[in-house]
């Protein structure tokens, strides 16, 4: 579409059928024990987003989530932070355990690379990692406002759910990596070599996150 070529789903399906191609799907993969655990007795955090997945500029709202990938060494967990303005992954961290430190490392990477001004929103689910004292301190020190969607409502964090779905279907896709190291290297290459610079989004006018930022960042500062 962005090259001016008119097409339709039926035409794409016909061409794929002629060449014997099959698209990838996002199935219900097995998940490790303990994922989806909500924080017990955590302080109440308001929803500052309200399913508004848009922003007028960079660093107004970041969305965060954690996913998991199977390897022959065991599960690998990945925490990611996305800037909703450009859909760019601005922070990520991977490790063998789903801890507060994992989520905090991804947030600290985002803070280091983006240097947001006071008032940037960090939106997540109610997972114990995001409700931790460690995350609270990091956000407070950076002037970031915490935000959490409703409990057990994936629609409140739909953009990062979509990101994790892309990683599963386009990078992992029914594979079992030999080691966590192999998974880390391939997911890193997917994010930095494809998702941010190449993968187009309809919400960005069929531009990739990097292309969108290059076209729209002019005259802006790193701070929101």
Residue positions per predicted region:
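Charged DNA-binding/catalytic regions of mobile-element recombinases
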Residues: 1-224
